[in-house]
Regions:
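Membrane-interface anchor segments at the N-terminal boundary of transmembrane helices
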Residues: 104-108, 323-405
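Membrane-proximal lumenal/periplasmic loop motifs of glycosylation machinery
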Residues: 47-62, 72-95, 99, 107
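Membrane-interface transmembrane helices that cradle and orient dolichyl/undecaprenyl
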Residues: 132-134, 170-192, 200, 218-224
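Transmembrane-helix motifs of polytopic, lipid-linked glycan transferases
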Residues: 108-132, 169-173, 382-388
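Membrane-proximal stem/loop segments at transmembrane-domain junctions that anchor or position
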Residues: 251-351
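Loop-to-helix entry region of an early transmembrane alpha helix in multi-pass inner-membrane enzymes
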Residues: 83-84, 88-95, 100-119, 153, ...
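Membrane-interface alpha helices of multi-pass inner-membrane proteins
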Residues: 141, 188-204, 215-216, 235-241, ...
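Multi-pass, polyprenyl lipid-linked donor-dependent membrane glycosyltransferases
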Residues: 109-116, 142-174, 200-210, 425-430
């Protein structure tokens, strides 16, 4: 009778790449079906109707479409106010995707977002499976691909899905480069990642911090301090071309030298003596009398908010705590806080359906609902940090992968502390947070024993 070790050798190796591809394509096909069955409707801009077809409206959907409409009407240098109040990057992406005509633009957008998300999830899982984290790769893949909020966001109008895919793609390429250690390919990976981080910043400027720190971490470890620092500088300069183009657009359009003029307003909502850190309560902000152009007023308001935080450390810490809770809060229930009312998942969520009756609403928003919500919030954070700690305790590559994920997660979280607490801001880093939670969950189910495999990968 064959021994256990011999039977293991005779057992065919599982083709994870094929399995990942099968599921990624299956989900993509299902999304295509959903996209082409979404009922068309009209919204109105400046007294004229605008057709919305093949997409759901995200939290700021109307504003993005208003910017897109301005670009269609007046071109890239449109003076439409929303294009300089908010970053014009996402409406410009929409304009680029309107090559089949404006009528098909939204359908093209959601197909593009869905395809990118499936590919990013697939590539991330494939690269993970080449490391000692192979046994975690399938669970992480399933948790990311089938998370209803994250996966359905690719069918909604909003930057969140593309930026979440961006973090997965850049992480996958970094892992691929570290494994291959091929200097000839490094320049290609550097260029691709720089463009991806640039496009992410193009749509949401605050993500540049995570991009810069991730790039430095990767290249310093890959090439050492001197060469790594030089390559990092080159990569960052490439990434900055994209937000710089928004400054150029705004200057040509309305004479404003800024990416957007809403930062101060957003920060002011989350600060002040009567602020809660979120969108609830009074929005009186901090004492400030800005003067000058809209861009100058925005800069002055940012300074006022920062000065208030420095002058009120106790109140600031309380607001930072509140914003952290809001950032990690559930999508629905008594603890939720943010702008995810249009989350597609909420239209079919059984918890939401329970609230249609008085008894169900009392259950969800009562004591039991609060306990469940807090367990969901704290449990998710516990799994995330446990997953990160599990990777930190491993050898170089696994620790490095954990650091790459945590850099993206922590920078996005910390930046929200000086702006406003909103669980929607969690979406861009949700793929990586689900990865760490998958590591934490599987390790926990194994009684705390990491599920590492031996491989000839980097040591």
């Amino acid at each position: 009778m064959a021994s256990k070790s011999k039977r293991a050798l005779l057992k065919p190796k599982e083709n994870l790449s094929r399995k990942f591809l099968y599921w990624a394509l299956s989900v993509l096909i299902i999304k295509f079906f959903i996209i082409f069955t979404i009922a068309a409707g009209f919204i109105e801009f400046s007294g004229k109707p605008f057709l919305v077809d093949g997409a759901w409206l995200g939290a700021d959907g109307e504003n993005y479409l208003k910017g897109f409409d301005g670009l269609l009407t007046d071109g890239v240098f449109s003076t439409e106010g929303i294009l300089n109040y908010w970053p014009a990057g996402y409406p410009l992406v929409l304009l680029f995707l309107s090559f089949f005509g404006s009528t098909w633009a939204l359908t093209t957008l959601t197909i593009f977002q869905s395809a990118i998300f499936s590919f990013a999830t697939y590539l991330f899982a494939v690269e993970l499976s080449k490391t000692r984290l192979k046994k975690y790769s399938y669970l992480a893949f399933i948790m990311i691909l089938f998370n209803p909020t994250l996966t359905l966001s690719s069918i909604a109008i909003g930057y969140e899905s593309l930026t979440a895919s961006g973090f997965l793609l850049t992480s996958a390429l970094i892992i691929k480069d570290i494994l291959e250690k091929n200097d000839k390919k490094l320049n290609s990976y550097l260029l691709i990642n720089s463009i991806i981080f640039g496009l992410m910043t193009f749509m949401q400027p605050r993500l540049i911090v995570g991009g810069i720190l991730t790039t430095f971490t990767w290249l310093l470890i890959r090439k050492g301090i001197k060469v790594g620092a030089l390559l990092s500088l080159i990569a960052i300069l490439i990434s900055l071309i994209f937000p710089a183009s928004l400054i150029y657009r705004n200057n040509k359009a309305v004479g404003v030298n800024s990416i957007s003029t809403n930062l101060g307003v957003t920060m002011n909502i989350g600060a002040g003596d009567e602020a809660t850190g979120g969108y609830t309560g009074e929005w009186k902000g901090v004492p400030c009398s800005p003067m000058g152009t809209q861009a100058e007023k925005d800069s002055q308001l940012v300074k006022c908010v920062i000065d208030w935080y420095l002058s009120n450390p106790t109140k600031s810490l309380k607001l930072f705590y509140n914003k952290s809770i809001y950032f990690w809060s559930p999508w629905f229930g008594p603890v939720k806080s943010g702008t995810m009312e249009r989350n597609p998942w909420l239209t079919i969520s059984p918890v939401v359906k329970m609230t249609s009756t008085q008894e169900g609403a009392e259950f969800v928003y009562g004591g039991v609902g609060k306990i469940v919500s807090w367990l969901w919030l704290l449990g998710g954070l516990a799994l995330l940090f446990y997953g990160y700690l599990t990777l930190w305790r491993q050898k170089f590559l696994e620790r490095f992968i954990g650091n790459v994920a945590m850099i993206a997660i922590s920078t996005n979280w910390l930046i929200s502390l000086i702006s406003i607490g909103d669980h929607r801001f969690r979406l861009p880093i949700m793929g990586l947070s689900l990865f760490l939670q998958a590591v934490g969950l599987k390790t926990l189910l194994r009684g705390g024993k990491p599920a590492m495999v031996e491989t000839s990968a980097l040591r």
